Amino acid sequence: MGKKSRVKTQKSGTGATATVSPKEILNLTSELLQKCSSPAPGPGKEWEEYVQIRTLVEKIRKKQKGLSVTFDGKREDYFPDLMKWASENGASVEGFEMVNFKEEGFGLRATRDIKAEELFLWVPRKLLMTVESAKNSVLGPLYSQDRILQAMGNIALAFHLLCERASPNSFWQPYIQTLPSEYDTPLYFEEDEVRYLQSTQAIHDVFSQYKNTARQYAYFYKVIQTHPHANKLPLKDSFTYEDYRWAVSSVMTRQNQIPTEDGSRVTLALIPLWDMCNHTNGLITTGYNLEDDRCECVALQDFRAGEQIYIFYGTRSNAEFVIHSGFFFDNNSHDRVKIKLGVSKSDRLYAMKAEVLARAGIPTSSVFALHFTEPPISAQLLAFLRVFCMTEEELKEHLLGDNAIDRIFTLGNSEFPVSWDNEVKLWTFLEDRASLLLKTYKTTIEEDKSVLKNQDLSVRAKMAIKLRLGEKEILEKAVKSAAGNREYYRQQMEEKAPLPKYEESNLGLLESSVGDSRLPLVLRNLEEEAGVQDALNIREAISKAKTTENGLVNGENSIPNGTRSENENLNQEGSKRAVEDAKGSSSDSTDEVKE
């Protein structure tokens, strides 16, 4: 996909003769592992730690220079082989071609008119690289012994990719040789480019991603050099940080969840050919057909011959796109910033507020979102703020009063205020909090816009500045929206306007918005706990997408798909202490605002 292609592409084969001994690198990686496994730094110390880790990583990269294997020629030179391989193995290759679209990079272009909802692309399971195929590969023996590979399918998939890339006769060579040689994820940012993200919400996840990737590399370098089941891996003599960063980014930008063959659970997969599609706003139009055992994609809209074919990756913020996919999407209708709010236990009404929130299914402390679109807050955040600002009398009404249950159900419905005073308080509170968050940035919106006019900015620097600008614009919109609502409800209160009456027939049931959704993103809109049942009809998948606005998300220029516990990115911390040395944590980059 698009913006990921670069000058040269990784190749299987042999690298340059090593000029540094494994023992020397082992000593450096041991130092790196120790540094990355230290407790989280205190407030204001994250940048210092990042620079220290980066210094060690750069020292390792310098000593390993020239050791990574590469493909000859350009990425696009191998596209014909990919199409031939895909066709011979049952994938659709008619009606589109791979083209460089400059701004968006490589993507698919229609060679004929394609109608909306027309099935135009399918890829059978045999072409997919999955955790299951990793288990059955040369990686299998090590996988069976290493708890980290077993616990983190994304890391297993990254090593599967590395092993197959280093095997000239790999079945997946036609796919692997068309992958980009490098990416625009923050793992590839120069230090000066990362500086542009300082004081943003995203910076915490950027630090976490870098630290966890370094920790994983340090851990697995030792494993590959010392574990008996790693002796036959083609990585034994050449496993560089550059290799691991590439594999991590390849998987992070492409991985998706699909059902296993028996349909009993989900697994991670890389989907050749299909992952060339670029992103636009819309609905999920890809599903997995268990009957035919293949990934299927229908057209998001009408595409005329000569037009680029887009798909929708999912309802992700630009922070998620930049960090996990390496691109910034202008006019992202699902963009948002995080805001962490909680009821203080020192609040004398804490117990009552906690009980009302519990009945509404909302925790007393949570990460919410302020959205790019109107309204800026979800039903869940509205309900939380209403409870947060309730008086003792209002709390009693929601716990013990007449129609208490109905009152709970309407907490998230903007049509039925608790009271005019409550509305004034909650919008005042939100206005103040968003204003405070805006003040934490080191630059203004106007300054960011001015910097973006600099023609000498790198692609990654521009992406970083756009991200911090986007965060501020969302917060500024929230401030203006909150101020407008505050004045409206203040006027209603002054005029002593009657509160809207509600009836059972028009109760607005509390539900999470897209922005606050934590449902797993799966090819077929399945929740892992429920298991995978009959294959979804494509039209049913589209219909369901309209309701849930969640489902399959695409690869290369896309977000990592699947449940957050397994593959939100390659750097998520596992639940078991035993594997902490190599697992990464997914810290929520939030600004905690607690009353």
UniProtKB/Swiss-Prot annotation:
Keywords, comma-separated and alphabetical: Actin-binding, Cytoplasm, Methyltransferase, Nucleus, Phosphoprotein, S-adenosyl-L-methionine, Transferase, Ubl conjugation
GO molecular function: actin binding; histone H3K36 methyltransferase activity; protein-L-histidine N-tele-methyltransferase activity; transcription coactivator activity
Enzyme Commission code: 2.1.1.85
One BP term from GO: peptidyl-histidine methylation
Residues involved in S-adenosyl-L-methionine binding: 75, 104-106, 254, 275-279, 325-327
Name of the featured protein: Actin-histidine N-methyltransferase
Residue span, SET domain: 94-314
Domain notes: The SET domain specifically recognizes and binds actin, suggesting that it does not accommodate substrates diverging from actin.
UniProt keyword annotation of Oxidoreductase present: no
Source organism (scientific name): Plecturocebus moloch
Gene Ontology cellular component list: cytoplasm; nucleus
Principal location listed in the UniProt entry: cytoplasm
Subcellular localization, as worded in the UniProt entry: Cytoplasm; Nucleus
Segments for region (Disordered): 1-22, 549-595
Function statement: Protein-histidine N-methyltransferase that specifically mediates 3-methylhistidine (tele-methylhistidine) methylation of actin at 'His-73'. Histidine methylation of actin is required for smooth muscle contraction of the laboring uterus during delivery. Does not have protein-lysine N-methyltransferase activity and probably only catalyzes histidine methylation of actin.
Family designation: Belongs to the class V-like SAM-binding methyltransferase superfamily. SETD3 actin-histidine methyltransferase family.
Pfam families assigned to the protein according to its UniProt record, in alphabetical order: Rubis-subs-bind, SET
Biased composition (Basic and acidic residues): 574-583
Post-translational modifications: Phosphorylated by GSK3B, which is required for recognition by the SCF(FBXW7) complex and subsequent degradation.
UniProt modified residues of type Phosphoserine: 513
Subunit structure as annotated in this protein's UniProt entry: Interacts with MYOD1.
EC class name: transferase
